[in-house]
Regions:
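Beta-rich globular "head" domains
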Residues: 120-130, 175-182, 340, 344-345, ...
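A short beta-strand motif characteristic of beta-propeller blades
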Residues: 43-49, 277-281, 402-411, 464-470, ...
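Hydrophobic or amphipathic alpha-helical targeting/insertion segments
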Residues: 88, 298-313
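Beta-sheet repeat architectures centered on beta-propellers
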Residues: 1-96, 255-265, 269, 273-274, ...
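Beta-propeller blade signature
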Residues: 444-453, 594-601
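Small/polar beta-strand repeat architecture
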Residues: 1-3, 14-15, 19-20, 88-292, ...
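Surface-exposed extracellular loop regions of Gram-negative outer-membrane beta-barrel proteins
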Residues: 487-513
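Beta-strand initiation motifs
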Residues: 86-88, 318-321, 399-404, 456-463, ...
Length: 782
């Protein structure tokens, strides 16, 4: 007879394989739709460019001019993605003028920089302007600090280089290199022929920032005409001599300090938070993970790192800055293509020299603006600066973000915060866990908000709506989220609803959840009017009341999380499939390698759970883009649900997907059953392979405690490929699989690992007959 096998949607690991009968027990890269399992969609990188660091924050918005942008916050930088390019807007921490700061060693690519001003840390970024040559090297542009010492740090001369394929090839980098300097090349892809990575070449025909290479000192320049190249290339130059101090007068511009890529546990007395653990016992603590919060204020962006200040990026200046010219006069006059209002802070950059009176990296303020022409002052509303002397090169207004407090109209802007949120409905800017008014002390339970429609005014007054309030339940605010009618605020022990009241209170907080937990600021997702979040031992939801979310994977998930890496956990929606995703580090892992999904649309609204393996660092499901976006460990963004394969790095790879059922009785009673064939029910619709296929495996058991029968088959096979053979007039595939299996219980598995394959399972049928009882099985033989 033929028996139809129909299993419930979702994966259940809360019980034994047998207790979870009629369901599914394990999965990887499989989802449920309309009650049946299918392989998830593929992913494609959005461009071939990459960013530096691990991305932990994504935000999508559109400017007044219709430009679609994404804020990308990493542990090393902050970028704005536009058209596949990652534009660096990392704010500046400080700028100083140094005299002969560089020390070189002959044949070495390491340069030591002396700067007694301090404030820099390992992995920070610094840009140099105005340097003169030292032993064949003119050190210009941006570098990452590799090692710090007392009043010194080191950098490597390795910098990006572009190669123009020609006869001979032309190389362009941020450094100026003298003829006969030794260099090596490296790449993330392939170098054009005949260039070979890590081979010594010599600079010839140098001219400014361009040069050519020869295989020998003073030899003929290398020809790359007709060749091809891929990836990002780097050139590393070696000093031609040893000098303790050189480079002339140098302007050094430092970006804000970088942060760690993952959580580094610390141990010892006082390392943990106050009140944590047993009195007198050293608790574990962590170096702070670099987490960003961000949101658009109109077309501009407000952003900041957890535990840091608030920054503001002005969309008027653009993602690459704005070119300008200076009329040397008393005062100097700047002419550019954009209109900037008085009080706007600006920083200037150049590939040459600014006139006397102005310097690279210094914050100036627009004064006497008439639109696209204005003067500059050292302070907001101050006297315009007189310029003199000469100038050279091309000048630009920097595209980098500024401290919000640096704007001329700024008043009592918080100097430190743990989370930023912009109210879409009421146009307030909120800071959570910030410093009190007129104090530098951070209060982890304090909420402050700006005046309505004014991101710079944080001073409460009878004439505005700026204000603050302090929450009482918990020890710190973790995160916040804008929902339809309220702002939800999570502390480490409670959930509050923040609602707009109007003057004079402006905003009020109501406790809506107690004795809860939340693992990180990014562990909350909002979909279909409901907020979902991951706690430290369970999942929750809030739909007007706080509830524990039933989870069929609770024990499986929470027994396999690296609790030291809680802060890395993040969530996101995939609303096209009614899904909430959480990504986490499995036990012993310091990087994200697992995910768990709650599908709130399955099981008649009760939802379904499933899980799998995937390495991601951030997620964004935006209605302003065609696909959900994710950040990867390949330092790029990928579109999910795009295609059926893995194209994270530019090379198309197959996605391995599988699902295994729980054990189910083949037939009620104590009789064994002999199965001679299985009739698959599957569709390969959407596959791009010519003959897509997967493997169906049947796993027989005598009873729930016996383990799988070995050998699994009786003189035949227990698995076979299922292949599509036609698509018209109907989709045809392997109609039946012949097996020889004798068992009382069984589990089944379907998997695929080939390129171009996607599938959805239906209801398989088994052709079987009764086959007596087995001796030694605990029942009488027969």
């Amino acid at each position: 007879m033929l028996k139809k096998i129909q299993l419930k949607p979702g994966v259940n690991r809360e019980n034994t394989r047998y207790t979870a009968e009629n369901g599914w027990y394990s999965s990887d890269k499989v989802r449920f739709r309309q009650g049946t399992p299918e392989k998830i969609g593929g992913w494609q990188r959005i461009s071939s460019t990459t960013f530096l660091g691990l991305c932990r924050s994504l935000w999508n918005w559109v400017t007044l001019g219709g430009v679609n942008l994404i804020g990308v916050g990493t542990n090393l930088k902050f970028y704005i993605e536009q058209g596949g390019a990652y534009n660096d807007i990392t704010p500046i921490r400080s700028a100083v003028t140094l005299t002969n700061p560089f020390a070189t060693t002959s044949g070495s690519s390491t340069v030591t920089v002396t700067d007694a001003n301090g404030g820099y840390e390992t992995n920070d970024f610094v840009s140099f302007y105005g340097s003169s040559a030292i032993n064949g090297l003119t050190i210009l542009g941006e570098y990452q600090i590799t090692v710090t010492g007392t009043n010194t740090y080191t950098i490597s001369t390795a910098v990006p280089v572009s190669i123009t394929l020609a006869s001979p090839a032309v190389f362009t980098s941020q450094n100026k290199l003298a003829n006969n300097v030794e260099v090596t090349l490296s790449t993330t892809g392939t170098l054009p022929s005949p260039l070979v990575a890590n081979t010594t070449y010599y600079v010839v025909n140098t001219s400014g920032y361009t040069f050519q290479l020869s295989a020998s000192s003073g030899g003929s320049a290398i020809n790359t005409s007709g060749s091809t190249q891929t990836g990002i290339h780097t050139v590393t130059a070696k000093a031609t001599g040893t000098t303790a101090a050189g480079g002339g007068t140098v302007r050094a511009v430092y970006q804000i300090n970088t942060g760690p890529a993952n959580v580094v546990p610390l141990n010892g007395w006082g390392a943990g938070p106050w009140g944590a653990g047993t009195w007198g016992v050293g608790e574990a603590s962590t170096d702070p993970l670099r987490l960003w919060s961000q949101g658009n204020f109109g077309e501009d962006l407000i952003f900041g790192p957890r535990g840091g200040p608030i920054y503001y990026w002005d969309a008027t200046i653009g993602t690459t800055g704005a070119a300008f010219t200076i009329t040397i006069a008393a005062p100097g006059v700047v002419t550019t293509s954009i209109s900037l209002a008085d009080g706007t802070p600006v920083v200037l950059t150049t590939d040459g020299a600014l006139p006397t009176g102005l310097s690279v990296g210094t914050t100036y303020y627009v004064v006497n603006s008439t639109g696209t022409t204005f003067s500059l002052a050292a302070t907001s509303g101050g006297s315009p600066i007189t310029t003199s002397g000469s100038q050279s090169g091309n000048h630009r207004i920097s595209q980098r973000g500024f401290l919000l407090s640096a704007y001329g109209s700024a008043s009592n802007v918080p100097t430190v915060q743990n989370y930023i949120l912009i109210s879409d409905i009421n146009r307030f800017v909120f800071c959570f866990g910030c410093n009190e008014l007129a104090s530098a002390t951070q209060d982890a339970m304090l909420i402050r908000w700006s005046d309505q429609e004014d991101a710079t005014n944080w001073t409460p007054a009878a004439t505005n709506q700026a204000g603050s309030l302090r929450l009482s339940r918990g020890s710190e605010i973790i995160t916040a989220l804008q929902s339809r009618q309220e702002i939800l605020v999570w502390t480490d022990a409670s959930l509050y609803s923040l609602q707009y009241l109007g003057a004079p209170e402006v905003w009020g907080a109501q406790l809506v959840g107690e004795n809860i937990s939340i693992v990180s600021e990014n562990a909350v997702a909002y979909a279909n009017g409901v907020s979902y979040w991951m706690g430290k031992d369970k999942f929750y939801k809030y739909d007007g009341r706080t509830q524990t979310l039933r989870c069929d994977l609770r024990q499986y998930i929470f027994s396999d999380i690296d609790t030291d890496q809680y802060l890395q956990i993040f969530s996101g929606t995939n609303e096209g499939f009614n899904e909430i995703w959480w990504f986490y580090c499995s036990s012993g892992s310091t990087t994200i390698d697992r995910y768990v999904i709650f599908n709130y649309g399955e099981n008649n609204g009760e939802g379904a759970w499933y899980y799998g393996t995937m390495a991601r660092t951030a997620w964004l499901d935006s209605g302003l883009r065609n696909f959900p976006l994710a950040a990867t460990y390949s330092n790029n963004l990928v579109n999910h649900e795009s295609g059926v394969d893995d194209n994270e790095t530019g090379t198309t790879l197959p996605i391995s997907a599988s699902i295994t059922s729980a054990e189910f009785d083949i037939e009620d009673g104590d009789k064994f059953v002999f199965i001679r064939r299985a009739l698959p029910d599957i569709t390969f619709r959407g596959s791009t392979a010519g003959s897509p296929s997967g493997t169906l495996t049947l796993l027989p058991l005598k009873n729930s405690g016996s383990g799988y029968i070995s050998p699994a088959s009786v003189g035949g096979s227990n698995n076979a490929g299922v292949t599509r053979t036609a698509t018209v007039p109907i989709e045809a595939f392997t109609g039946q699989v012949y097996v020889r299996i004798r068992a009382r219980q069984m589990s089944m598995k379907f998997e695929s690992s080939a390129q171009g394959v996607t599938w959805q399972l239906g209801s398989m049928r088994l052709d079987m007959r009764e086959d007596g009882k087995a001796s030694g099985s605990g029942v009488s033989g027969g």
